[in-house]
Amino acid sequence: MCRTLTKVLLKRDFGLEWDMPDSHLVPGLTGRINYLNWINEVLSLLPSQEGKTCNSGSVAITEATTRRTIVNGIDIGTGASCIYPLLGHSLYSWKFMATDIDIESIESARKIVSMNHLEDSIQIVQRTPEQPLLEGVVKEGVDFCMCNPPFFSSAEEVDMNMISER
């Protein structure tokens, strides 16, 4: 039910097509949107192209961010849902480079980006655990970098992850 609700809300509120493998956890939208709004607020406190800052009211914050020419973000560990790049682009027209180490997540994220014709705005990059996080990935200026801790569906999955990292 949560998967269906997320799919319907993304379509209704953001015009996004979305689907992902059943084997992955479904992201809650409210917390993700709040995180992106917080990043937008932080960006608004930085000098704009005109050297001004803005730090009051959500409308002014949005205006401050839109004064920046292009906002580029990196989502480390984007997951199968690619939710932050999708919402960040929909809400603020940000461009994203999204990375992950899981091939199923990469394939799912690429499919979602393609379904929404966002290849010019969201780039999906596969990494390996051995590679440095950002080396060779960042090719132009980056305004922010974001990540979340891994999400697990059960205590057993947490235990398995701990064992595999040793």
Question: Which residues fall in each region the model found?
Answer:
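N-terminal auxiliary segments of SAM/dcSAM-dependent transferases
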Residues: 1-28
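Charge-biased, low-complexity intrinsically disordered regions
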Residues: 4, 25, 43, 61-63, ...
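N-terminal pre-P-loop "Q-motif" helix
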Residues: 31-35
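Phosphate/ATP-binding catalytic cores across multiple sugar-kinase/actin-like superfamilies
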Residues: 37-42
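Conserved class I S-adenosyl-L-methionine
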Residues: 53-80, 95-97
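Conserved SAM-dependent methyltransferase scaffold
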Residues: 82-85
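Caspase-like (clan CD) cysteine peptidase catalytic core
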Residues: 88
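S-adenosylmethionine
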Residues: 92-94, 101-166
